[in-house]
Amino acid sequence: TSSTRVLTDEIIDESIFGNTTSFLTFKMFEADGILGINFQYLQKSKDFLTPICIDKNTKIVLELANGKQVKLVNSTDLTTCNELQYDAINKNNLRVLNGFFYFSPENFTDLKTEKVYLIKITANTGDVNFVIKPYLNSEIYKTKSKPDTYFIENLKCLGL
């Protein structure tokens, strides 16, 4: 029998600067013993937004407080880009990038005890970096969270 457990979306990073708003959310999952995250990176701006494309070589790198790195690999060989959309009502350009990334079995142990201070998406169109805050008071979601302990808290929920 197969088993899948999926946690709810949590906001990891939010940026509101000038005409541009962006945010990153993670949804952790475990499917038949494989641990991964579904991420979504949304950008909204009155200005032009540069496209981001991910492919089979794209990785997500988590920089931990102890100096170690945890790397996640893309779950697909397909190239995916955040296509430009236009919100005519609010006159905003929108780009949404989604992806599924897996941990290798041996490399997520440190996430049980170490805070994450930087998340880097190594895309084929260039790296995207997120400096992770200890506390996030989201203006978009109207929530408060502790993104740097996301993995410490949520790995427990999956019984890992």
Identify the function of each model-found stretch.
Residues 72, 76-160:
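Internal interaction segment
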